[in-house]
Structures are given as structure tokens and as C-alpha cells.
């Protein structure tokens, strides 16, 4: 019998595992793994949340989007309602995803660009791909990476950056920084969705002039079919697919497919921005049609990969994940991410594994650093989880809902900003602007002054009774709640050796367990 494993998490991503033939000697077969993670895909932007069997388990209205493939996928899967992106920003989340470490240890505390040498994925730690490679896997990466400090290493223009923008954001990742990926079709970050580019394994640039998720899905299908003998068919494979949309821009048909836009183009904005905390009068509101069109396009691209897996008999295990959400006119902010609001932090996570994982909903508050060890655990590689990993392996809970596993009490929130600059204007440190904690009931975020390190702003929401986070509660009137959240936050900050713990920031509020 085939065993299929599929996981969908935040922003949106796909991780797939499938079984291989058992080697001689009767040893357990190694599963194939595919992990797809679209950028800036929020948990609320999935149609099935409004359908029977799902809507009863969440206290929010889903966005009015069309995601038919994800709808079907979710009904065969374990779906998390409360997966969290702890530092809801592209590079920091990806650093945590790859290393299983929080941003202060992964090497990626800030979004990567050429002005931030302080932010680049560490070369001296084993990433999830290093572990899979060491276990005998062929490893392939497709699409957006955005974890490297850009340097002037353009393969086609030696001594120059791969883009002329200042600071440079896009980056070429040389072979020695690919962490076990032996097949490469990737770029750093570039936001022209119908004019993407990629560097292949040998550093050759490709400019396909095609909407990037559909192009990447096609390349994944080609890899699955082993066109050109790009992988060893006797080996299991680990694939990561970093789709950029529905990440901004979302302003015109240059950013999405017209057939998807047509589903939304005639809808009044107040019928699209239906969350009570959304403001359809904001200038950004027109973006909703294009954002939702990109969501539908990503769903279609995901479907192409699923169809190929089924066609080839490789649909046995699959997981889906993302990096952060999108506020989209909620909370009266133009910033789509990097905030403790549920639209930004709460991401999709879905797992399908017939015969192994029971289709169900679960409120496990999975954090970004937990993904790497959990994926390794699901692939039977728990014994190979690196000692550097700070996240927790929750694979036993996926495989058995009654497993004796200590669940997290909540998820840490992290916001870092640029710190000190050197004489050349390069960022040499980062400012830990905010830390917070989200439990099943409340969200707390504390913001400090850059110089004094004193509290300057707080957010406290009763998420159970105020799911759209419209009523910021005063700290002094909710002391018992704040004390409890700060106690939980202090434990995690100490455990991960966060700058707030090292500097004892707000120690009058946060007990660090001295």
C-alpha cells in the first residue's frame, strides 16, 4: 500500500514525502520529500476554512479565495490551525526553516541585502538539506532562497553583483554555500513575477519569461520525471520549492495570471476585504484582487506538482509550508508582515500521510525552528537531527495524536531592525526591537526604545474573544495575564540565548529564571 505524506504550512509551502523501494535486507525504505513554500501566503487565504469540518475549528472568516486543489488536499491531511512564523519576514524565517535555529543563531536575523553583512545563512552548521544529503538523498532546490548576503560574484559578470540595484537584494549562491543540494535552480530574491531568472547547478542563468510559480512547478515536474537524468533514480530525493508569489508586488497583470485575476476583478473591495479589521478605503486595497489571484495561481501550480506525483506513482508523501503571512489592509498598516498580528504570524501547515497520519485538525502551535527537526522525524531521521537545532521534533504527535509529547505553551514573536552602521554604511549589528509571546488565548508584544531599552509600546490581545485583534488591552489592568505570558516568554528567550535574555531587557517584567 502506498503511504502518502503531505504538509502545508504558513505563507504557503509544500513538503512532499513518498516511499521508495525497500533496499535488500528488508530495511525500512526511505521516503521521498517535497517541500513547497510560497512566500507571504497567510493562513486565512485558503478556501477550505469556510467549509464544513473546518470552519467549526477556527474563529475567523476565511478570505473569499478559490483554492480547489488545497481544499481537496486538506481533506486528506492533518491541518494545523495555529502554526506560527516567529519572525514573520522572508530571510529570518528561511534561516530558521533550514537550520532549526532561531534568527539570533541561524545567522539570519534580518532580511538579506548587500548592506547587511550581519545577515547570511551560516556555513558552519548542518541544514536540513545537509542531513538529507548525508542520509543518501539527492537534494534539489527550486525558486527563491533569500538567505545569502549578496556579494559581487555574478557568474556571468565576475566582480559584479547579480543586479545593479543599490543595495543589492538578489544573490547568486555558489556551490560551496548550497548545503548539500546537488541540483540547483534558484535565485536570491527578485520581484518581477513574470520575468524571473534562475541560476542552475553550474551557474548558468536562465530567463524563462513565465509566471514564476508555474515555471517552477514545471521544472519540479521535469525533475520528478528525471528528464535529462538529473538525479539517481535509485536514490530517494528531497526537494524544496520556494515560490515567490503571492509576495508583493500585486499591482497589475504583470504580477499574476489573467485567468486567475478574472475570478476577482469584478468583485467589490468590501466583498474581498471581509475581515472586520480591514480597511477597504486604504490605497493598498486595490491590491487584494491581485493578491488573491496569485493565491489561486499558486494553488494551480501546486496542483501541477500533485498531478505529476500521482501520474508517476510518487504521491506517497507530501508536505506544504510558508514563511509569513500578509496583513492586506488589516490593522490599518501598509506593512504586510513583520508584526505580531495573526494575518502576519499565522501560517498554513498541512500534512498528508495515508495509513500513517490520520486526517484531522490540530491546534499544535508549531514554530519556525520546529519544522526542520519535525520533517526529519517524519522521514525517519530523528537520530540525525543536529545538536545545533533549537526547535523541537513533533513528528510523534503527527503520527499518533495520543502520543506522549509535551506540547508548546505558545510561540515566540521576534522583530529585529537594523543596528549600528560602519563607516561604509554597512549594518554590523541588529536592534532587537520587539519580543512577544502568543498563547492559545492571548498575543503579547513588547517594544523597546533603541537607546534606553525601556518599554515604549505594547500590544495585548485576547485572541479568543477578539480574534481580529481590534482591542489593545492595557497591561496594568491585565497584570495576571501579562505576568503569565512574560514568564513563558522568559523561559524561551533564556533557552535560545536571545539578546533580550543576554541583556536582561525588561527584567522588571520578564523573569529570566536567574
Regions found by a protein language model. Give the residues of each.
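Formylglycine-dependent sulfatase
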Residues: 2-13, 20-447, 453-456, 467-487, ...
Amino acid at each position: 500500500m502506498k503511504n502518502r505524506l503531505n504538509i502545508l504550512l504558513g505563507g504557503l509551502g509544500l513538503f512532499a514525502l513518498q516511499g521508495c523501494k525497500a533496499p535488500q535486507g528488508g530495511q525500512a525504505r526511505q521516503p521521498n520529500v517535497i517541500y513547497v513554500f510560497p512566500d507571504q501566503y497567510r493562513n486565512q487565504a485558503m478556501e477550505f476554512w469556510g467549509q464544513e469540518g473546518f470552519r467549526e475549528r477556527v474563529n475567523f472568516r476565511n478570505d473569499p479565495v478559490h483554492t480547489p486543489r488545497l481544499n481537496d488536499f486538506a481533506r486528506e491531511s492533518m491541518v494545523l490551525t495555529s502554526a506560527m512564523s516567529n519572525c514573520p519576514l522572508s530571510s529570518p524565517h528561511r534561516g530558521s526553516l533550514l537550520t532549526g535555529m532561531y534568527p539570533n543563531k541561524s545567522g539570519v536575523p534580518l532580511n538579506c541585502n548587500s548592506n547587511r553583512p550581519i545577515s547570511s545563512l551560516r556555513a558552519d552548521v548542518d541544514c536540513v538539506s545537509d542531513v538529507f544529503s548525508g542520509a543518501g538523498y539527492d537534494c534539489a532546490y527550486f525558486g527563491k532562497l533569500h538567505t545569502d548576503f549578496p556579494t559581487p560574484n555574478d557568474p556571468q559578470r565576475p566582480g559584479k553583483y547579480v543586479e545593479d540595484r543599490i543595495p543589492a537584494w538578489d544573490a547568486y549562491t555558489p556551490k560551496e554555500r548550497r548545503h548539500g543540494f546537488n541540483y540547483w535552480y534558484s535565485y536570491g530574491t527578485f520581484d518581477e513575477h513574470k520575468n524571473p531568472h534562475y541560476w542552475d547547478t553550474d551557474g548558468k542563468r536562465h530567463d524563462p519569461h513565465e509566471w514564476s510559480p508555474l515555471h517552477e512547478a514545471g521544472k519540479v515536474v521535469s525533475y520528478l520525471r528525471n528528464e535529462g537524468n538529473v538525479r539517481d533514480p535509485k536514490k530517494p530525493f528531497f526537494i524544496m520549492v520556494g515560490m515567490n508569489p503571492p509576495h508583493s508586488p500585486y499591482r497589475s497583470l504583470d504580477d499574476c495570471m489573467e485567468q486567475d485575476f478574472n475570478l476577482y476583478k469584478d468583485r467589490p473591495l468590501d466583498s474581498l476585504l471581509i475581515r472586520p479589521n480591514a480597511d477597504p478605503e486604504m490605497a493598498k486595497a486595490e491590491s487584494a484582487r491581485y493578491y488573491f489571484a496569485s493565491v489561486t495561481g499558486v494553488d494551480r501550480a501546486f496542483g501541477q506538482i500533485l498531478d505529476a506525483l500521482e501520474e508517476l506513482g510518487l504521491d506517497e508523501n507530501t508536505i506544504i509550508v510558508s514563511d509569513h503571512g500578509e496583513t492586506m489592509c488589516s490593522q490599518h498598516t501598509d506593512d504586510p508582515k513583520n508584526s505580531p498580528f495573526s494575518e502576519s504570524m499565522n501560517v498554513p501547515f498541512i500534512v498528508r500521510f495515508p495509513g500513517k497520519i490520520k486526517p484531522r485538525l490540530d491546534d499544535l502551535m508549531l514554530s519556525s525552528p520546529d519544522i526542520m527537526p519535525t520533517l526529519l522525524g517524519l522521514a525517519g531521521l530523528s537520530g540525525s537531527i543536529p545538536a545545533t537545532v533549537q526547535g523541537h521534533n513533533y513528528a510523534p504527535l503527527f503520527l499518533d495524536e495520543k502520543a506522549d509529547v509535551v506540547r508548546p505553551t505558545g510561540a515566540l514573536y521576534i522583530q529585529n531592525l537594523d543596528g549600528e552602521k560602519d563607516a561604509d554604511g554597512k549594518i554590523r549589528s541588529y536592534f532587537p526591537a520587539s519580543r512577544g509571546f502568543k498563547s492559545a488565548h492571548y498575543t503579547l508584544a513588547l517594544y523597546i526604545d533603541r537607546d534606553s531599552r525601556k518599554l515604549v509600546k505594547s500590544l495585548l490581545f485576547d485572541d479568543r474573544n477578539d480574534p481580529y485583534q481590534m482591542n489593545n488591552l492595557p497591561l496594568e489592568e491585565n497584570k495576571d495575564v501579562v505576568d503569565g505570558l512574560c514568564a513563558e516568554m522568559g523561559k524561551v528567550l533564556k533557552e535560545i540565548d536571545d539578546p533580550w535574555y543576554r541583556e536582561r531587557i525588561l527584567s522588571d517584567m520578564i523573569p529570566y529564571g536567574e
